[in-house]
From Swiss-Prot:
Species assigned in the record: Drosophila melanogaster
Name of the molecule in the record: Exocyst complex component 2
Region called Disordered, residue ranges: 398-417
Keywords: Exocytosis, Protein transport, Transport
Domain IPT/TIG: 5-89
Gene Ontology CC annotations of this record: annulate lamellae; axon cytoplasm; cell cortex; clathrin-coated vesicle; cytoplasm; exocyst; neuromuscular junction; plasma membrane
Gene3D superfamilies in alphabetical order: Immunoglobulins (2.60.40.10)
Coiled-coil blocks: none
Recorded name of the encoding gene: Sec5
InterPro entries attached to this UniProt entry: EXOC2/Sec5, EXOC2/Sec5_N_dom, Ig-like_fold, Ig_E-set, IPT_dom
Membrane-traversing stretches: none
One GO biological process term: exocytosis
Family named by the database record: Belongs to the SEC5 family.
Feature: compositional bias, Basic and acidic residues: 398-413
Amino acid sequence: MAPQPVVTGLSPKEGPPGTRVIIRGEFLGTRVQDLIGLKICGSDCLLSAEWKSPNKIIARTGPAKGKGDIIVTTLSGGVGTSTVQFRAYHETIGPLKESAVWIEESPSQNFAWGRRTLAQSGLTQEDPLGLSIEGNEQKIPEDLRDLFPEACGDLSQEHFSPAWFLLENHLATSFEDLKAGLSYLKRKVESQKEGQLSFLKSNAGSVIDQLDTLMNIRDKLQEDVKLHGNETLNILETSIENSISESQKIFTDVLVRKEKADSTRSVLFALSRHKFLFCLPNSVDRRAKAGEYDIVVNDYSRAKNLFGKTEIPIFRKVLEEVDHRILSIRKQLHEKVVKMPQSVEQQKKLIKALISLELQQSGTPIGDKLRNIDPAWDAIEARAKYLEWTFRQTFDQHTSKDSGAQEKAKNRDSSQAPNRVNFCEELCDIAASQLPDLWRLGQLYFTGELRGPHDPKPGDFKRMVLNAIEKFCVYLRLAILIATDQRALRQSSGLAWPIGSASATHQFLPWIPQCLRFTRIAYATLISLDLPSEALDIIQKLIDEVRLFCFSIIFKRATDRCKKLGSQETWELGVEEYPGATLLPAALETLLIETLDEVQSVCMQRETREGNLLEPQSDGQREVTQRLQEFLSAFSAVIEELAFHSHDEETPTHNVSQLLGFPNAQQPDSVAGSGGAAAVTWEQRMLCCLANYAYCNKIFFPRLGDIFVRYGYPLPTLAIETARYTVNQLFTNLLEEYVEHKGDPLVGTIEPSMYLGRFQWDHEMEIGQLRPYAHECCDNLVGVYSEIYSISPALLRPILESIVQTISEELARLMSCVQRFSFTGAIQAHVDIRLLRDSLEGYVNETAKNYFMEALEAINPPLSGEQKRKADEILERVKRNMRLQLLCFSVKDP
């Protein structure tokens, strides 16, 4: 029940009857019909009430008088309360003033003169004390009515109070003036006490008017006597008696007609007892056409109960006619029960009516002419067949559309959903709406509400449901799993979706998450039905397949984007963990995180009753591994393409001998120092690619594994190790390419520079400094060192070790080819070889050490003690002179 009405505001708070008041408050009714009562000062004002809102009512006051509450009564809240009051008062009404209530029309008495006046005193009233009130301000104190509750200050009223009058009109008048006014009033009263003659003089006009009126009355009476005679009252009496006699005749006639009506009513009542039976044949037909089968069942049951055992021939004949009509209605009902489409409630209503009619006609000759074994089961079979037919019809419609639209696929708007997507949406809508209806109808059948005379068939119904769900999943597989092998599915189902063009397939793939969402919505609807697990497992398997397929599609799309990362390479060195690496791996990491976010939101996040795709040794885990391998392999190929594609576009400059007239190429200070990728040389790109490979192998790829773990995936060890192996292979190939590019020209200059100017080792020569070929070899190595160090110091050791090994091998070969060394030639060769070996000691591996040893041992004849001492002195002096040049080779772990 709603709260009681409460009146909290009123405007105005006082007034005469008929005052229009605005009532405000709370819970004053929910609508106009809810307001059933309104009392103001105890007077009912409902007729004048105008409901505006639950907080506002407008009404007019009644004829009440005094202070009182405003009580609002509503249907919802009952009788209410009021926190404010209204003061009703009656004001003096003149002959020309409208009034909302009936007033006393007798002339008011002028108490000042002691007799009634002919005219209203209010029109000519002056101050009875004879005092001027022009300067006085009339005030009515708030407590004036409380002081005189039953009085007023009006001279014309019976309850006139002199004290009220004085307080109201002469509040500021002095006492002396009041005494003077009293004297004036006394003189005025004395002057009115004159004789009849003076009264007639003062009222001569009124007396003459009264005499004229009496003369007019006398004339009218005389005219009536002439017209009707002296016995006017007898004529009136006769008319009244005639009216009485005529009224008695009319009343007697009414009584006679009433008796006839009662007798007719009795006859009709007697006939109406059996009218139901006689009208029943037409009634059941009319009700059946209107679909009111409940009424048909009730009427037929009532007729059977009333007249089923009668022996009256006419009744038996009518009952037989009714039975034939009911038999025809049963046939119509059975046809309607199996006719689709229709709602479960409608089908349930028809089945109940059909079962009731069959039970009432069972055991009778007419009932045996039509025997419906089990109408509820027939309805279930009809609904199951209609569901399968709807699936197939929808499939055929969309496949035919797809077959005819293949030529237009290239011009299709990418924002327009492909036909496969529309098919998935429509098929899921059908399953979500019709499968629950089939299940509910089956539950009504097996719980006994619609059960017929035969035992239920739960096994058959289960097969119906499973078959419908399997067909549903088959159609979705044919439409969604477009890139999978469907030969077995086509052979088992005999169905196939038309093979579209590559562009149509490409347009459909981004819509697969939408198809997954449609399937999940239908699956959630079926879960709420409490279907058996066997049925739900069929759809769960399909959803897991679609989820995995969706994952594969998203990662393939990411792999395609990864293959295009090479165009985003700016050759900007911004990796703190591994100097020389560019921002390309960071772009790959961003792409991978975006892909994992999309996968997580679209397909990998499990919903109600969905499987875990990442179970150990599952297809999902294998798919994740395979897609990640493809993703990382594509990235490795991007780096390789950047390196070797650059090699094809540019003609790299080689470090050749300055002694032969070909200066070394000038290298920029840094990769990004020239302001863009166009200024990056081939050597710098090769070094950046090598650094990227090394960074991916040591740091970046393991970090990607941590990202997968953070997203809830198992650590993809196999994919990461495979990618690292691939990266190592590519690193080795790229390293060999770079070493060959830098080392072969350097080594090739040693022999020409060594024998420049017809130099021979067996001739005596001036010693004391390094030979030009050794100087040039050191300079070239410093140049290579500088180039590598400016990009990625971590690549110094693997690159320089290979180049130094090649140099040592070349020196060993050249020294072994010398037949004989002169005294000074042996010292010079010893100094040159030892300087190169000692200065490059940090980048000399075991093979290079052996080659340097072979080169020293090839000096023939071997050095004597004096030669060794001389060679040591020269070597120390040369090292001091070249200490700044050789200082870079002495830095460990640059």
